């Protein structure tokens, strides 16, 4: 099974976006 650069990019994005929103939400809740 070949892993293309596109798939790596999509997987990275898919894991980064929720983490980013969770971080923003956590910061706004702490204020």
UniProtKB/Swiss-Prot annotation:
In terms of superkingdom, the source organism counts as Eukaryota
One GO BP annotation is: photosynthesis
Q: Keywords, A to Z? A: Chloroplast, Membrane, Photosynthesis, Photosystem I, Plastid, Thylakoid, Transmembrane, Transmembrane helix
* Transmembrane portions of the chain: 7-26
Compartment(s): Plastid, Chloroplast thylakoid membrane
Query: What Pfam family is a match, any one?
Result: PsaM
**Span of the secretion signal?**
none
> What GO cellular component entries does it have?
chloroplast thylakoid membrane; photosystem I
Q: How does it sit in the membrane?
A: Single-pass membrane protein
- InterPro entries xrefs: PSI_PsaM, PSI_PsaM_sf
Membrane as a keyword of this entry, yes or no, is yes
Spell out the family assignment given in the record's similarity comment: Belongs to the PsaM family.
Cross-referenced NCBIfam families: PS_I_psaM (TIGR03053)
Quote the protein name from its UniProt record: Photosystem I reaction center subunit XII
**High-level lineage:** Eukaryota, Discoba, Euglenozoa, Euglenida, Spirocuta
């Amino acid at each position: 099974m070949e892993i293309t650069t596109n798939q790596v990019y999509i997987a990275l994005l898919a894991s980064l976006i929720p983490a980013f929103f969770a971080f923003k939400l956590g910061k706004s809740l702490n204020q």
